[in-house]
């Protein structure tokens, strides 16, 4: 008799999910940063409520209220890419520390202006922009260090914990802000936010990040930025994630952008806005646990699409409902749907991007993500200004539901490639009299293959897949040629801008790429022969 497959009971399954979620907390640095970040994010959400309520109190219309979120999101669109390049070039700990100090300084200035009464709508938007600019420079690096703090198998759980932390702050901060605003005035929220940066600064300053040896020459900001754009262009999975996230957030942004106006129409008290935003955060905390259970049963595409569809339905419901209790329930559901989509795509980007380009890829992800939010907030705010907030929310919700159809064209991957480096290529022995420098080039690299004639067709199919890898890692041109006199000989060629860039190619090759390389060489009769040719400029 064959053994029956084991199926865990619902109680065992729930216990397994819970254990997986909390496992990353075993790492002290991750745990300390997470705890410090809770207090910092609570302060951030308290200020967000304070800023939105202050804008309403200054008699600004829905357009100005929505622009508060635009001012928070726009810096990610403008600065995320160079910030990601810095995150891959500079010491990540020092960069995080610098940005935290900058944000603390701006928060102190903003708090002083609000408390003293010298604030105006445009000044509030400008300082919100400056504060968010620090966050834009920090976030790609902050997310890039996550794989350094937890094991690879705990990365999705760590992302979920970050989501729980963030949305726990979203649940606590707004409600606390509403109480403080009602009791002591709106300036209190800005003061609390300024003080909330102290914990993170202390933990980051104490963090002893291991030094990582780099064999390839360091990149420059412009070159690193171009390398990131090239990597995303030739990485199908990463590109699909980024496109999906940007389009979804364009429509999803309407719910939070117009929530202050919805709350103000329901109740004149700031507590109502804090309650609705708190319910959204509480729902996101619950959604993080639902995500772990759902991922064990359904594909990434199914879970993500379901989350977006539910979020769209919640947005439509907010456009219809008028009672505070009903709106609170809808926001609870919407928060859970929100975190399911965000956690999934964030963890996938971190897994798909190798360490050498991770901060830059995350920066591109944040650029499109926050760009979608910034554009969406402005557009749906303008629609709300002219056609009414309910109409704006209705169309945004329908648009969010429609984005689930993108899965037909850009499907989210269920499995991730092994992007660990596979630096096994033989380094050429260069004679001293050649005078080869790091900036010498362009460099023409050729790889000669002697192919088994019976497998020539399979070889060509496999080697043409190599083009995407070569271009992704730095090649500007690529080709495969067959020798007319010796039909079994094939020559692969690609050009790299400099010798330094070719050395970086050695570090960018991954274990997943090596699997394709082994497949290609399995069709050959001997070891491929590699040559490196350096461009020789005419002498003047």
What are these model-derived regions, one by one?
Residues 144, 148, 190-220, 297, ...:
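Helix-loop junctions on the cytosolic side of multi-pass membrane transporters
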Residues 49-59, 110-116, 172-192, 261, ...:
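Transmembrane alpha-helix termini and helix-breaking/packing motifs in multi-pass membrane transporters
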Residues 29-49, 69-87, 91-106, 123-182, ...:
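Substrate-agnostic recognition of the 12-TM MFS/MFS-like secondary transporter fold
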Residues 2-5, 78-82, 89, 95, ...:
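C-terminal transmembrane bundle of multi-pass solute transporters/carriers
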Residues 15-74, 230-278:
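Helix-loop boundary and gating motifs at the non-cytosolic
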Residues 416, 468-477, 495-531:
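An amphipathic, aromatic/His-enriched active-site/gating alpha helix that lines ligand/cofactor pockets
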């Amino acid at each position: 008799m064959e053994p029956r497959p084991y199926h865990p009971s619902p109680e065992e399954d729930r216990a397994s999910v819970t254990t997986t979620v909390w496992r990353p907390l075993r790492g002290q640095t991750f745990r300390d940063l997470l705890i410090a970040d809770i207090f910092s994010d609570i302060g951030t959400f308290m200020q967000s409520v304070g800023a939105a309520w202050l804008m309403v109190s200054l008699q600004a219309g829905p357009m100005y209220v929505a622009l508060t979120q635009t001012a928070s999101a726009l810096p990610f669109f403008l600065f995320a890419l160079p910030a990601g390049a810095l995150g891959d070039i500079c010491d990540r700990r020092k960069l995080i520390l610098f940005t935290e100090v900058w944000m603390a300084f701006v928060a102190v200035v903003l708090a002083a202006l609000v408390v003293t009464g010298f604030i105006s709508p445009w000044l509030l938007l400008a300082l919100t922009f400056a504060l968010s600019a620090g966050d834009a420079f920090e976030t790609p690096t902050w997310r890039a260090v996550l794989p350094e703090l937890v094991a690879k198998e705990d990365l999705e759980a760590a992302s979920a914990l970050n989501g729980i932390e963030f949305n726990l702050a979203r649940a606590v901060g707004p409600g606390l802000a509403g109480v403080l605003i009602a009791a002591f005035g709106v300036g209190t929220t800005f003061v609390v936010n300024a003080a909330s940066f102290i914990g993170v600064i202390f933990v980051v300053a104490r963090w002893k990040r291991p030094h990582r040896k780099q064999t390839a020459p360091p990149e420059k900001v412009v070159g690193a930025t171009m390398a990131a754009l090239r990597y995303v262009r030739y990485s199908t999975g990463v590109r699909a994630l980024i496109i999906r996230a940007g389009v979804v957030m364009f429509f999803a942004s309407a719910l939070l952008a117009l929530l202050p106006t919805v709350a103000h129409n329901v109740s004149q008290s700031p507590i109502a806005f804090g309650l609705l935003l708190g319910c959204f955060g509480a729902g996101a905390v619950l959604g993080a646990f639902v995500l772990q259970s759902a991922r064990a049963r359904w594909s990434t595409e199914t879970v993500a699409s379901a989350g977006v569809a539910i979020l769209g339905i919640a947005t439509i419901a907010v456009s219809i409902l008028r009672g505070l209790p009903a709106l609170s329930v809808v926001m609870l559901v919407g928060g859970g749907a929100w975190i399911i989509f965000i956690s999934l795509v964030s963890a996938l980007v971190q897994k798909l991007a190798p360490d050498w380009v991770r901060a830059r890829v995350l920066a591109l992800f944040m650029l499109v993500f926050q760009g979608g939010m910034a554009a969406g907030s402005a557009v749906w705010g303008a629609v709300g200004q002219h056609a009414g907030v309910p109409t704006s929310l209705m169309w945004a919700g329908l648009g969010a539901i429609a984005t689930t159809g993108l899965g037909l064209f850009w499907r989210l991957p269920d499995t991730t490639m092994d992007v660990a480096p596979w630096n096994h290529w033989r380094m050429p022995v260069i004679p001293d009299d050649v005078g080869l420098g790091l900036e010498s080039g362009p460099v023409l690299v050729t790889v000669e293959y002697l192919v088994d004639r019976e497998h020539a067709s399979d070889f060509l199919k496999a080697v043409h897949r190599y083009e995407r890898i070569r271009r992704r890692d730095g090649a500007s041109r690529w080709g495969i040629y067959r020798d007319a006199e010796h039909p079994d000989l094939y020559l692969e060629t690609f050009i790299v801008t400099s010798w330094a860039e070719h050395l970086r190619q050695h570090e960018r090759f991954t274990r997943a790429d090596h699997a394709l390389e082994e497949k290609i060489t399995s069709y050959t009769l001997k070891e491929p022969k590699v040559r490196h040719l350096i461009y020789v400029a005419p002498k003047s």
